[in-house]
Amino acid sequence: MVIQKWVGARVGLMGNPSDGFGGKTIACLVRNFGAQATLRESSTVEIVRHPVYDPLSFSSLEHLEETAAHDGYYGGIRLLYATCSKFRHYCRERGIQLPDRNFALQYDTNIPRQVGLGGSSAIIAAVLNALMEF
């Protein structure tokens, strides 16, 4: 079984970031950009790193430094890890029985980083949609 979920980028026109404090916003979808989560049934729970956004090997120390300067120290793995953990916690706290199955989870995105298009939110929403269907 393979589940794929896509969530579009969004741009906040008014109110950002007041929504984080109970405020209201006006936002719109940017269809050109989005994030996708792919979930496959597996024998273990596996979070698959993105080869571009979650690098673990570099051609040189200079390449590592340039990557860190451009992308920061965190990739999308932490978002998948946190979403899965919080999903499990939410279900357990509410007595929602989850099936006794494991999965491999990966993401892809073409949302530009650090430009206010909600890239992290789109990844989280796509993962959550895939987990709920699974």
Regions found by a protein language model. Give the residues of each.
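Short, conserved phosphate/pyrophosphate- and ester-handling motifs at nucleotide-, phospho-/glycolipid
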Residues: 120
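ATP-binding N-lobe of GHMP and related small-molecule kinases
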Residues: 1-117, 129-134
